[in-house]
Amino acid sequence: MPLFFSDNLRAALECLLFVAGGPVSVDSLAACLGVKPGDVDELAAELQELYAREERGLQIRAVAGGYQMCTRPEFASYCEALLRPELPALSRAALETLAIIAYRQPVTRTEMEYIRGVKVDGVLNTLISRGLVQEVGRKEAPGRPILYGTTPKFLEFFGLKDLKELPPLEDVAASQENSREAGGRGSIPGHPGEE
């Protein structure tokens, strides 16, 4: 039996997402509300529709395998005027390395360095310490190098539901070929910080 009356479940979901401050898995929400995971998806869809219809400043988004309450992008400038980011923005080198990992994961440090044409040790350590990248295994190759991949925090950071929301790799590959023709080694173009 649900913890709340059925008429209040949508409001209860709204409260849970508000106090969470970040993405909450469907299973966690279902357990708190005493409903099935499919019911959470239906309640979230109702909230999404309500927020869109009433043109609220907030939205409910499917992010990293769950749901999150967040501000609508068109109101970002107001939020930025009020808040200062806790962490400095990612450098161009970090964004390039992160793009390589996102599109080619799992990927080794050596593969990243080949694509970028420079060492990535410092940048990789920064991405790991920020929780955007993690070790995901070992490559079946001599020396068994560490493989890296993105984390759920990466999805949250970029507001993605899953990696399928990244721009199609074909578009990136075409831009990469243009970069090679211009004399580059093939770093992943089409991402913030590209010149």
Curated annotation (Swiss-Prot):
Keywords in alphabetical order: Cell cycle, Cell division, Chromosome partition, Cytoplasm
InterPro entries referenced in this protein's UniProt entry, alphabetically: ScpB_csome_segregation, WH-like_DNA-bd_sf, WH_DNA-bd_sf
Pfam families: SMC_ScpB
Positions of the UniProt region annotated as Disordered: 169-195
Subcellular location: Cytoplasm
Lipid metabolism recorded as keyword: no
One Gene Ontology CC term in the entry: cytoplasm
GO biological process assignments: cell division; chromosome separation; DNA replication
SUPFAM superfamilies attached to this UniProt entry: Winged helix' DNA-binding domain
HAMAP family referenced in this protein's UniProt entry, alphabetically: ScpB
Record's function text: Participates in chromosomal partition during cell division. May act via the formation of a condensin-like complex containing Smc and ScpA that pull DNA away from mid-cell into both cell halves.
Subunit text: Homodimer. Homodimerization may be required to stabilize the binding of ScpA to the Smc head domains. Component of a cohesin-like complex composed of ScpA, ScpB and the Smc homodimer, in which ScpA and ScpB bind to the head domain of Smc. The presence of the three proteins is required for the association of the complex with DNA.
Family under the similarity heading: Belongs to the ScpB family.
Name this protein carries in UniProt: Segregation and condensation protein B
Species of the source: Moorella thermoacetica (strain ATCC 39073 / JCM 9320)
